[in-house]
Amino acid sequence: MASVSLTRVIEKMKLENLTPEIDVKHVKITQPDINRPALQLAGYFEHFDATRLQIIGFVEYTYMEGLTDETRREAYEKLMAYDIPCIVFSRDLKPDPIFLETAIRHEVPVLSTKKSTSDFMSEIIRWLNVKLAPCISVHGVLV
């Protein structure tokens, strides 16, 4: 299965690593699709594809801000119990300390971009589709 290293994604997309204590060298992105985990933060995990890169935009961010610390901790624990390749905060939004603490404990890299959610999503999807596209080699002989 084709994959792209998270290190390459960080370099190409100019992402800031908010969890440098997590070794990202061995993390692979294998899915060109992404997910905005709004429903998962609200507790709905049916049909959740944890292999996708997760993006937190302004809507998810403001939802999380409105939760109590206890509810936040519970939502983060449920989300990060899955084997997520990484979570990217858009618009230069910064996660709260509970989020970072949970991510570090579950070894889920947390990244940040200054780009708007829509701009980042379209750029990363386009780039991942090219990098993860099926590829075949055909050997031929000219006579």
Model-derived features: where do they sit?
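Short, flexible, solvent-exposed loop/turn segments with mixed acidic/basic and small polar residues
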Residues: E74-L79, F99-T102, V141
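Short secondary-structure boundary/capping elements
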Residues: L67-T71, P95, C135
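Gly/Thr-rich phosphate-binding loop signature of adenosyl cofactor/nucleotide-binding cores
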Residues: M1-M80
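Residue-level preference for the first positions of well-ordered beta-strands
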Residues: R52, C86, G140-L142
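Glycine-rich adenosyl-nucleotide cofactor-binding module
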Residues: S122-V143
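Conserved beta-strand segments of the P-loop GTPase G domain that flank and frequently precede/overlap
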Residues: I56-F58, I87-S90
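Short, contiguous strand/loop micro-motifs
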Residues: T62-Y63, P85-I87
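Charged, amphipathic alpha-helical linker segments immediately N-terminal to NTP-binding catalytic cores
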Residues: D83-C86, D92-W127
